[in-house]
């Protein structure tokens, strides 16, 4: 019987510079998913690579005093070496400067032109060089790029355009009938409400103002727009041929099962890419997942901000698997995660050194101390053993359920419950006490056998996330690798096996002070220019009549997520938000248009008064209130919880306004 196929891709990394840990996270995440699918028995093809054309790269190469090709060769090599360092098990590393890719892109452009989907015209508007994106004046936010926030420059040039509107209705229908296509759901709502439903404009797909790109073969003064070039890597990398001579690999693997990308480029992958595929008469990918960002304490990592942490530096301090564990475990499903050196040390000590490393070391050491390393199941059981076994055997299904939904961080948490339960089992059975009683030797042997078996099961599940650690643990236990199917049974470790007599420390505890001293030597802190602090203004709040606690307790506060938002027509102050609270979605109208764009609101966690009587604002029903605060200058900001502990909040401490006050009506 042939294995089911699974084709997973990352967004190809842009070759503008050395990748930081935020860029690297995506490759590690894709690798964990690919490894788990292989464990499940899938025939996996995992593709990653580098995006190497565009005006930004041409300018960077000029600054460096090298040719564009020399520049991308160097950076692509850096990216590949980092992916290899992080133990990513990709099957194909594609470069958009590969000759076969470039030829197919030219053919694809020509085919779309011949079909009438591409036509020649003149482009006039705004262009963001870092994002390689075109915008109209109305799409800019305060005159800047809506994606990255950098300044845009006017652009006017002859160009080819793609008729996006031709396929818009078909794409909308596809998204409606395939709810799994764009994930998480908040990203889908953003694409539908902000781009597709308002109507698509034709897309500029060529440039003449720079040369570093793939020439349009029938009009060589034009180069192909970088996103048309880059997106097609997903098909050219597995052997797509525009003339119909597709490779066996393409016929087997397409459509892709998962495009894993950053949330900042989801528009290109869920609007442009599927429309390009429709033009080529190819099936659409099954799912596009826009993962959140890994932030460095004070925001998104950026070389210009000077807050970058690099993967190879982290590996030098902590090791590959510790870094893999951190980035996979600390990234929520749909919220940004945070990485700092201090957090890395904390996780290293508490979870890797204590929970996992100490468990393995203690178990092996006790096996050597009491039985010369021989691990035997003597069958002397107690009720606590049954509890341990049933708990451990319940975990694989939980991990599988989490991985099916791409909740990788939650899956790792489930795996570590096995190691925590084994540590608890040591406290419950007290092997050191059993060792003092000659009559309890068989019971002691059984306890140690159960520990070794539990570690083997947990370690097998750990293999997708920390592959080297898995090999090291199994090697020390003298245990063979298992399949996920094997994990349905407790007791497969061969009784009488002998563990190593020289246990190695898997993860050493680290001193935060020493680590930070070395980090500061590596990256000396920048001296911030001293600024005179403006005199703080004390805001006089108009006294309101006192209320009793019982009055306050009547209010119900819940945390929700804004999944869609739009400006209220004919209102200068109102935004209408769709807020997901638990399993329900509420419509809430707020007078915050002067402070937030609809795009900024989408994805925000907000606090909502949910038992407020529904009211109409500007003729639109509002089913609650989003809580806000106001500073001395009258600026309003949404109250956003740092994290969600639970949906219902018993109390809160903030200043609130009536709907009519904040709406200004």
Question: Where are the language model's segments positioned?
Answer:
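Structured secondary-structure scaffolds
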Residues: 2-48, 100-104, 148, 154-369, ...
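N-terminal catalytic cores of NTP/NDP-binding nucleotidyl/phosphoryl-transfer enzymes
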Residues: 2-75, 94-109, 114, 131, ...
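A glycine-rich helix N-cap at a beta->alpha junction
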Residues: 76-91
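Cys/His-rich short segments
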Residues: 115-168, 172
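Helix-rich, typically C-terminal accessory recognition domains appended to large enzymatic cores
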Residues: 120, 343-380, 391-499, 609
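Intrinsic disorder at enzyme termini
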Residues: 473-551
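Phosphate-backbone binding interfaces of nucleic-acid-interacting proteins
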Residues: 530-665
């Amino acid at each position: 019987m042939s294995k089911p196929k699974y084709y997973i891709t990352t967004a190809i990394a842009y070759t503008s510079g050395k990748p930081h840990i935020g860029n690297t996270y995506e490759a590690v995440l894709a690798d964990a998913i690919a490894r788990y699918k292989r464990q499940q028995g899938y025939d996996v093809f995992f593709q990653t690579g580098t995006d190497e054309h565009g005006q930004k790269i041409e300018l960077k190469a000029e600054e460096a005093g090298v040719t564009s090709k020399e520049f991308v060769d160097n950076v692509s090599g850096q990216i590949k070496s980092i992916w290899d360092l992080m133990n990513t098990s990709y099957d194909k590393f594609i470069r958009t400067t590969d000759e076969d890719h470039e030829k197919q892109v030219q053919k694809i452009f020509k085919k779309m032109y011949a079909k009438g989907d591409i036509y020649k015209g003149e482009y006039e508007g705004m262009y963001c060089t870092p994002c390689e994106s075109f915008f109209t004046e109305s799409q800019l936010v305060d005159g800047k790029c809506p994606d990255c926030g950098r300044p845009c420059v006017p652009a006017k040039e002859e160009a080819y355009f793609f008729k996006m509107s031709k396929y818009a209705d078909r794409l909308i229908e596809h998204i409606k009938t395939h709810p799994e296509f764009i994930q998480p759901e908040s990203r889908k709502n953003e694409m539908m409400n902000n781009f597709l439903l308002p109507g698509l404009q034709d897309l500029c797909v060529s440039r003449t103002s720079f040369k570093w790109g793939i020439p349009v073969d029938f009009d060589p003064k034009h180069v192909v727009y970088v996103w048309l070039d880059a997106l097609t890597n997903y098909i050219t990398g597995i052997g797509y041929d525009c003339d119909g001579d597709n490779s066996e690999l393409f016929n087997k693997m397409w459509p892709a099962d998962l495009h894993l990308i950053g949330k900042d480029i989801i528009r290109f992958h869920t609007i442009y890419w599927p429309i390009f595929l429709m033009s080529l008469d190819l099936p659409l990918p099954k799912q596009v997942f826009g993962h959140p960002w890994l932030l460095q304490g004070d925001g998104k990592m950026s070389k210009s901000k000077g807050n970058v942490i690099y993967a190879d530096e982290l590996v030098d301090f902590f090791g590959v698997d510790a870094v893999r564990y951190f980035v996979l475990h600390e990234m929520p499903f749909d919220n940004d995660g945070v990485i700092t050196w201090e957090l890395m040390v904390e996780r290293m000590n508490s979870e890797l050194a204590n929970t996992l490393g100490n468990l393995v070391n203690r178990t092996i050491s006790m096996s050597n101390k009491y039985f010369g390393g021989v691990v035997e199941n003597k069958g002397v059981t107690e009720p606590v053993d049954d509890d341990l076994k049933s708990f451990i055997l319940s975990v694989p299904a939980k991990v599988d359920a989490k991985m099916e939904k791409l909740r990788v961080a939650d899956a790792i948490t489930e795996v570590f419950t096995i190691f925590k339960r084994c540590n608890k089992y040591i406290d419950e059975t007290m092997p050191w006490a059993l060792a003092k009683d000659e009559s309890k030797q068989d019971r002691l042997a059984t306890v140690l056998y159960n520990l070794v078996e539990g570690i083997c099961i947990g370690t097998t599940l750990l293999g997708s996330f920390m592959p080297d650690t898995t090999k090291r643990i199994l090697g020390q236990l003298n245990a063979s690798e298992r399949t996920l199917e094997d994990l349905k049974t407790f007791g497969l470790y061969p009784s009488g096996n002998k563990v190593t007599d020289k246990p190695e420390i898997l993860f050493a505890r680290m001193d935060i002070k020493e680590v930070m001293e070395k980090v500061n030597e590596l990256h000396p802190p920048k001296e911030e220019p001293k600024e005179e602090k403006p005199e703080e203004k004390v805001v006089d709040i108009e006294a309101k009549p006192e209320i009793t606690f019982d009055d306050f307790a009547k209010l119900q506060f819940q945390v929700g997520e804004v999944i869609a938002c739009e400006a209220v027509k004919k209102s200068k102050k109102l935004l209408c938000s769709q807020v997901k609270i638990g399993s329900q979605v509420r419509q809430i109208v707020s007078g915050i248009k002067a402070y937030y764009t609809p795009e900024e609101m989408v994805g925000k966690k907000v606090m909502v008064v949910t038992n407020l009587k529904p009211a109409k604002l500007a003729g639109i029903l509002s089913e609650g209130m989003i809580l806000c605060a106001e500073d001395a200058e009258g600026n309003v900001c949404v109250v956003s919880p740092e994290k969600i502990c639970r949906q219902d909040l018993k109390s809160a401490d903030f200043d609130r306004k009536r709907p009519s006050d904040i709406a200004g009506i």
